[in-house]
């Protein structure tokens, strides 16, 4: 009867059967320890959680496995030698710890050999043409060799070869007198004649500054006074002219009136 399926009613929790009996029951859940007691191992002999299988490794006391039992596949590497890729099989031997070291040693040796193939060494240090193409050459060693490649003209003097001697430090400064160093065969430029009063006022003010300032102040005051007097005189003349013009206009008006009255008197007779 244990193999028959158990019927389950709706609304009730379902519990799987325990052991060989077909009775339903709660699952085997470990109970919490009673208060006041330290927690201990939880049902270490439970069949639902079997202990993990131990995998004996190389660090165990059994020692390394035999050569006959070694079933690890060979390791394939790509090694670059002089631009060509070739496959190289590396077999592990002498345990798991020795295999990576052997692979690394072979890899480093292959990489070093490949690096040595790409280097360009100078066969003759005296030949500057070939030594310039070297990669690992310091600048202190290459500088005199590069300077030796520059072909100097034997006709040039030592002063002309050196730019510092050819162009002195003060060559950019303006020369005061161009007549001394003027090149021969070229006439010097004709300068305009110097004015006689050039810089006279500046020199006077620099020598007698306060006196010149006072003198100029008095001159300005006198000029203002004369201008004021002239303006006053002009105003007086304008007033006189206006008076004369008004008198003339009045006289003309009176003459016209007298002429009209005399003409009317004659008409009445």
Swiss-Prot record:
<feature type="topological domain" description="Extracellular">
    <location>
        <begin position="268"/>
        <end position="269"/>
    </location>
</feature>
<comment type="function">
    <text>Transforms host T-cells, inducing T-cell lymphomia in the host. Activates at least SRC and LCK tyrosines kinases, thereby activating signaling pathway transforming host T-cells. Human T-cells transformed ex vivo display a IL2 indenpendent growth phenotype.</text>
</comment>
<feature type="modified residue" description="Phosphotyrosine; by host LCK">
    <location>
        <position position="136"/>
    </location>
</feature>
<keyword id="KW-0597">Phosphoprotein</keyword>
<feature type="compositionally biased region" description="Polar residues">
    <location>
        <begin position="91"/>
        <end position="101"/>
    </location>
</feature>
<feature type="compositionally biased region" description="Pro residues">
    <location>
        <begin position="27"/>
        <end position="41"/>
    </location>
</feature>
<feature type="compositionally biased region" description="Low complexity">
    <location>
        <begin position="61"/>
        <end position="74"/>
    </location>
</feature>
<protein>
    <recommendedName>
        <fullName>Protein tio</fullName>
    </recommendedName>
</protein>
<keyword id="KW-0945">Host-virus interaction</keyword>
<feature type="region of interest" description="SH3B/LBD1">
    <location>
        <begin position="186"/>
        <end position="195"/>
    </location>
</feature>
<feature type="compositionally biased region" description="Basic and acidic residues">
    <location>
        <begin position="1"/>
        <end position="12"/>
    </location>
</feature>
<feature type="region of interest" description="Disordered">
    <location>
        <begin position="1"/>
        <end position="127"/>
    </location>
</feature>
<keyword id="KW-1133">Transmembrane helix</keyword>
<feature type="topological domain" description="Cytoplasmic">
    <location>
        <begin position="1"/>
        <end position="246"/>
    </location>
</feature>
<dbReference type="GO" id="GO:0016020">
    <property type="term" value="C:membrane"/>
</dbReference>
<keyword id="KW-0472">Membrane</keyword>
<keyword id="KW-1032">Host cell membrane</keyword>
<keyword id="KW-1043">Host membrane</keyword>
<comment type="subunit">
    <text>Homodimer. Binds SH3 domain of host LYN, HCK, LCK, SRC, FYN or YES. When tyrosine-phosphorylated, binds to the SH2 domain of host LCK, SRC, or FYN.</text>
</comment>
<feature type="region of interest" description="CSKH/LBD2">
    <location>
        <begin position="158"/>
        <end position="167"/>
    </location>
</feature>
<dbReference type="GO" id="GO:0020002">
    <property type="term" value="C:host cell plasma membrane"/>
</dbReference>
<feature type="transmembrane region" description="Helical">
    <location>
        <begin position="247"/>
        <end position="267"/>
    </location>
</feature>
<feature type="compositionally biased region" description="Polar residues">
    <location>
        <begin position="114"/>
        <end position="127"/>
    </location>
</feature>
<keyword id="KW-0812">Transmembrane</keyword>
<keyword id="KW-0553">Oncogene</keyword>
């Amino acid at each position: 009867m244990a193999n028959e399926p158990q019927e389950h009613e709706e609304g009730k929790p379902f519990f799987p059967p325990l052991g060989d009996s077909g009775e339903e029951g709660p699952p085997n859940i470990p109970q919490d320890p009673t208060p006041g007691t330290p927690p201990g191992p939880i049902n270490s002999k439970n069949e639902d959680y079997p202990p993990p299988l131990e995998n004996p490794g190389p660090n165990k006391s059994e020692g390394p496995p035999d050569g006959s039992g070694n079933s690890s596949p060979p390791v394939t590497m790509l090694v670059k030698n002089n631009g060509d890729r070739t496959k190289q099989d590396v077999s592990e031997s002498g345990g798991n710890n020795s295999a990576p070291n052997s692979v690394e040693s072979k890899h480093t040796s292959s990489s070093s050999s490949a690096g040595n193939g790409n280097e360009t060494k100078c066969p003759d240090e005296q030949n500057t043409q070939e030594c310039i193409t070297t990669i690992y050459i310091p600048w202190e060693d290459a500088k005199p060799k590069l300077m030796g490649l520059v072909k100097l003209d034997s006709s040039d003097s030592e002063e002309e070869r050196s730019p510092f001697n050819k162009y002195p430090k003060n060559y950019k400064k303006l020369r005061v007198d161009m007549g001394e160093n003027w090149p021969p065969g070229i006439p010097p430029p004709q300068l305009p004649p110097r004015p006689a009063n050039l810089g006279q006022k500046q020199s006077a003010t620099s020598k007698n500054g306060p006196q010149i300032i006072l003198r100029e102040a008095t001159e300005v005051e006198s000029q203002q006074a004369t201008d004021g007097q002239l303006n006053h005189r002009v105003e007086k003349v304008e007033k006189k002219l206006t008076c004369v013009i008004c008198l003339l206009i009045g006289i003309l008006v009176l003459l016209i009136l007298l002429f009209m009255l005399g003409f009317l008197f004659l008409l009445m007779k």
